[in-house]
Amino acid sequence: LTHLFANNMTSRNGGHILNVASLAAWTPIPNQNVYAATKAYVLSFTQALHDELKASKSGVTVTALCPGYTATKMMDNPAQGGKLLVPSSMLQSPREVAEQGIEACLAGRSTIVTGLANRITVAITRLFSKMALAKIAGRYYRSNMH
């Protein structure tokens, strides 16, 4: 589907595609393995396509939007009567995520990780063992799922 839109935009000499990945693409979390894997695919696919289209001078840019925790229904924990999976102070509003995604599109960026705390998380993930971070995140999720 992305290639179909990219071909159409290329014929018009410009356009932008925004694919939604996630912070989970950078920091895989136990108990969310399929989600993290699909988001990692979206991130990798988007970055590769961004470079392909940039090299071809198509005028089309592709951006991966990687939001962290966002105040949506996905953050509700039905096992605990709808209690949030994370503290509300960690949540971004959908509007904040959308605005940062649009800014990244306009700047022609291949990737945007929304929110300062999330960008710091990605930087730490790149510096330290993913295994250690996954264990910490896994403990947090397991303690909040029961």
Predicted feature locations:
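SDR active-site lid
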Residues: 52-117, 131-134
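Active-site-adjacent segment of SDR/Rossmann-fold oxidoreductases
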Residues: 8-9, 27, 48-60
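Short-chain dehydrogenase/reductase
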Residues: 111-125, 138-139
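Active-site helix of classical SDR
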Residues: 2, 38
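Residue(s) in the substrate-gating loop at a strand-loop-helix junction
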Residues: 22
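Active-site loop immediately N-terminal to the catalytic Tyr-X3-Lys motif
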Residues: 29-33
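A short helix-coil junction within the Rossmann-fold of NAD(P)-dependent oxidoreductases
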Residues: 4-13
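Rossmann-fold scaffold of SDR-type NAD(P)-dependent oxidoreductases
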Residues: 19
